[in-house]
Amino acid sequence: ILEGLEFDRPVMVDEVFPDEFDLEETHDRIYENTVELLEFDRPVVSIGGDHSVSYPELKALKRSNPDINLVWLDAHLDIKEKVGDNISHDVVVRQLVEEGLFDPEEIYFVGITKIEHDEEEFLEENNFNLYRPEEIEEFEQEFEGQAYISIDIDVLQKELAPGTGYPDGNLDLDQVLK
């Protein structure tokens, strides 16, 4: 993925191999790897997996940088209530709030096209920043500060990401890259 790209400072590339039978073990590996990478005081870029991968990364990042905001580019909120012990892709943001790692005011949902019925109450109870696709310019003007940026492929228009399981997105590539 990085082949042929030029950077103005050294870049480290690392891999975390998932335990396909144990999500909690995979999260532990990702967390520990992220903690180690943050010690080098360089930006961390993570590619691959569903949004459950973001959970351990965000735990590590927030503990090392308490002022960080979360910009969540996704067609969906991912604030469903957790069922069982596993932290799946659709509960990540809610889990981060419930654990006290992020205040809702530090979370910016961008590109949201669908709010699930079982997410409405939690959304109304919290003061999240919510920007639908037609409000992307408003987000660009209002947002300030440092951020962990998470991009779910389903935020893109279905013509740009036809293989996603949730084809509700409405952003084009230029909007996402800004």
Residue spans for each PLM region:
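Conserved alpha-helical scaffold segments that buttress catalytic/binding sites
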Residues: 1-178
